Amino acid sequence: MWQETDQKKSIADDSDMAELSFSVNCRELPYDHAYELSSEILNLIPQIKNDKRNSIQTLHGPMSGNGWVRPDSENIPLSKRAKLIMRINKNQIDDIKDIEGKEIKLFGNSLKIGVSKVKNFLIVKDLFCRFVISDKKISEDDFLEKIQMELRNFNVNIKKALCGRSMTINFDKNTVYTRSLMIADLSKEESLKLQEEGVGGKKLYGCGIFLPHKSIDAVNNFKED
């Protein structure tokens, strides 16, 4: 896997988007907490809606323990290393940082938002998305074809793609059907574009956000051949 390691030469430096990572202090949350978390964040910083590329990631603990995949209904413990990560237009970063020190209530737990750090995107060949909004009735092939058509608008041509696990997410009083997705063998320009734009809807609720495919939790999300 190639990976840009020299930040001075990274094409991500020229991007108008970046990651804003906040430390958090929270004991635990349910796996399915995207709607509640994002709703609280949007109440604090409604201006995050001003750029449709902006996104809010869900918080994640370990996806498996001793080889056993935890059920989606189980609460996840959050360590001191847990981060609240957003992808933000660089022009908005100072405004979004205003949530430092704020405290919100989620599922009876207190979540305190700490200091933030700004990071450029990590440019890698393979990207992974935990939750892509999908129609439950369509096949995996039709789903991938739909994704391919959307990404062509951003000059991203899919060479290799793999659907992973499907799951539903609670969204207010409704449920949303999602699939996980890995896209491989991207060019540097395509990798950056995918991380800037995402795919599909509800990016402010943890969906459609592409992450570097480098961690064990990403591997655990995919079905064996």
Where are the predicted features?
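RNA-interacting cores
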Residues: M1-D225
